[in-house]
Curated annotation (Swiss-Prot):
Any single Pfam family the record assigns to this protein: Pox_F12L
Triggers of expression: Expressed in the early phase of the viral replicative cycle.
Name assigned to this protein: Protein OPG056
A GO-annotated cellular component: host cell
Keyword Membrane: yes
Keyword Membrane: yes
Entry's localization field: Virion membrane; Host endosome
Subunit structure: Interacts with protein OPG164. Interacts with protein OPG064.
Classification of source organism: Viruses, Varidnaviria, Bamfordvirae, Nucleocytoviricota, Pokkesviricetes
GO BP, sorted A to Z: microtubule-dependent intracellular transport of viral material towards cell periphery
Length: 635
């Protein structure tokens, strides 16, 4: 089994081999090392990310294990309460989702009945979901003629003498609860089909839920510490035995991983006496250090670990940064060299426990020397980038592309006086994220050639992006940028699917789409009904000139870093759902998808195998490579 995986890794440069490798990753986690000896844990959820960061054919496969884990994500965002919008029809009134729909009904009826309006103004009414309490209030104000009557009771002839009574249709709706509809006209009323929606767009559009990105960039921190976790191979999988820090201590324990971690956490707590947040800086820590510690994380230790964040029970926070994501693919020694510190080797990971014990004294010293070099390089790089990308600071970002693009967008925004905003509320963020589709759309299975957009940067830098806070609109305005909750109906004829949906048996579904994706889908024959949208009246102009200026500035500082950064920006948009430029990523991905579809339109559909926002698989038998395809690169 191990030999088979080792061979697959050495030849994992084509789609078929990678798919076979994925099958093994459903059962095992691959233990690998790079040329510098740094451990890397490869599992089914992170292999794509690893392949985007490095050439996996150059990794050394050490073993397979089931005794490991993935990064522990932050607690999931609670599901938002499903939403029904208000419907005021000539035959009925259905209030929007509310804890007190009966109160909404009586307030709506007061628009027609002045005596109800006067009583509400004089006396007010307490919130209640009880019909008997509503009727008691009406009776006490001399308004018993408007008493609330359930539709079923009215039909039993029990209340026919009350000609002015408020007849309500009572129901229970899943994930919402009790709901009532005021029946205005019994002769024409039929219970309506009401869309139960995943988002309340009006609520999401509230001004206080949106913050200008520039106001979130000027942050300070007190302390930075370089850190590295070393792991040895045991019968039960990889085991951490040493945690080194600089400046700081080295912790070693071959007998109890729990004690190793607790000693490290006690030391962290001691140095946080004067600050609530510190920064730990590792190298490839997201690929080895953090997931390895997560496996052994002690219960009831006073700290929780979520991805790269440690949070203590008293609210102290440790951000564990991965400097590799700011290196543009450089090895640790090259990174240190390029940022002016002396490159030093580090102890190898994933060695036998007995070898680690035998060499521990020399490896403690070697680890400290390597960490000192990493610390100095990181401090130099962060200082330089914070000048060039002011006011962005490295510790506020998870990778260099995000920092670079944020600085460009902020600069353009400030120069034009039109800032980009981002959502601060979990539900608002989830709505925006829901419009982002990174999945492959499968058309058919056939032997195919893979093509990728030649320059993502060229496509996205010439487009427009939202500026200012959004407004709520029922339907988006043509020519403006907006994100809408949509009811989508797929075409009845043969078609290339454009809007991703994971249920092939459903022809109508509700999803979130950008105005760019709506235009693309409509062109492809989809029927789309907009159920509410966030719309922006202003746009940030083209980013191209500012992008080029920023690239030149970084190039003058460090040509190797800039070339690698530029290559990453050209090849990919690494979407980051925690980014403050979430809106930029949303529309950038839509623009790329629209470009891919414009190419699909020029090709006979029988040759299309699958596609994503940046890649297109075309049948190997297709020979008519047209001029449009010149903007794609064959992989």
């Amino acid at each position: 089994m191990l030999n088979r995986v080792q061979i697959l890794m050495k030849t994992a440069n084509n789609y078929e081999t990678i798919e076979i490798l994925r099958n093994y990753l459903r059962l095992y986690i691959i233990l690998a090392r790079n040329e510098e000896g740094h451990g890397i844990l490869i599992y089914d959820d992170n292999i794509d990310s690893i392949m985007s960061m490095m050439n996996i054919t150059r990794l050394e496969v050490i073993g397979l294990t089931t005794h490991c884990t993935k990064l522990r994500s932050s607690p999931p965002i609670p599901m938002s309460r499903l939403f029904m919008d208000e419907i005021d029809h000539e035959s009925y009134y259905s209030p929007k989702t509310s804890d007190y729909p009966l109160i909404d009904i009586i307030r709506n009826r007061s628009h027609e009945q002045g005596d109800i309006a006067l009583a509400l103004e004089r006396y007010g009414i307490d919130n209640t979901d009880s019909i008997s309490e509503i009727n008691e209030w009406l009776s006490s104000k001399g308004l018993a003629c408007y008493r609330f009557v359930k539709f079923n009771d009215y039909r039993k002839q029990m209340y026919r003498k009350f000609s002015k009574c408020t007849i309500v249709d009572s129901m229970i709706i899943g994930h919402i609860g009790h709901h009532y509809i005021w029946i205005k006209n019994l002769e024409t009323y039929t219970r309506p089909e009401i869309d139960v929606l995943p988002f309340d767009i009006k609520y999401i559009s509230r001004d206080e839920l949106w913050v200008r990105i520039s106001s979130s960039l000027d942050q300070t921190h007190i302390k930075t510490i370089a850190v590295s976790v070393y792991g040895a191979i045991t019968d039960n999988g990889p085991m951490p035995y040493m945690i080194s820090t600089y400046p700081g201590n080295t912790f070693v324990n071959f007998n109890s991983v729990k004690d190793l971690i607790l000693n490290f956490l006690d030391w962290i707590k001691d140095i946080m006496t004067s600050t609530r947040t510190i920064i730990l800086v590792g190298y490839m820590s997201n690929l080895f250090d953090i997931p390895l510690l997560t496996v052994y994380w002690p219960n009831n230790c006073g700290w929780k670990i979520y991805n790269n964040i440690l949070i203590s029970s008293d609210g102290a926070r440790v951000i564990w940064m991965d400097a590799y994501k700011f290196s543009c693919g450089l090895s640790l020694q090259d990174y240190c060299y390029h940022w002016g510190s002396k490159p030093e080797s580090r102890p190898f990971d994933l060695i036998k426990k007995s070898d680690a014990k035998r060499n521990i004294k020399s490896w403690v010293k070697e680890s400290m020397t390597s960490l000192k070099s990493l610390y100095e390089a990181f401090e130099t790089q962060s200082g330089a980038l914070e000048v060039l990308m002011s006011p962005c600071r490295m510790f506020s970002f998870s990778r260099i592309e995000d920092m670079f693009l944020t600085s460009v967008i902020n600069r353009v925004s400030e120069n034009t006086g039109m800032g980009m905003y981002y959502p601060t509320n979990d539900i608002s963020s989830l709505f925006i994220e829901s419009s982002i589709c990174l999945d492959y759309i499968i058309v058919n299975n056939q032997e195919s050639n893979k093509y990728r957009i030649k320059s993502v940067l060229d496509i996205i830098s010439s487009k427009q992006y939202p500026a200012g806070r959004p407004n709520y609109v029922k339907n988006g305005t043509k020519g403006k940028l907006y994100i809408a909750l949509c009811k989508v109906t797929v075409p009845t004829n043969d078609h290339i699917p454009v809007v991703y949906h994971d249920d092939d048996n459903t022809t109508t579904f509700i999803t979130v789409l950008t105005s760019v994706d709506i235009e693309t889908a409509t062109r492809a024959g989809y029927s789309i009904v907009e159920l509410g949208a966030l719309q922006w009246d202003d746009n940030i102009p083209e980013l191209k000139d500012c992008l080029l200026d920023s690239i030149k500035m970084i190039y003058d500082l460090n040509a190797a870093t800039t070339n690698n950064l530029l290559e990453q920006l050209i090849e990919n948009i690494n979407f980051n759902n925690s980014s403050i430029i979430l809106l930029f990523y949303t529309f950038a991905i839509s623009y790329c998808r629209a470009f891919i579809y414009s190419i699909i339109e020029t090709i006979d559909p029988v040759y299309i195998s699958q596609f994503s926002y940046k890649e297109l698989y075309i049948s190997s038998s297709y020979k008519d490579i047209n001029e449009v395809m010149s903007q794609m690169v064959k992989l």
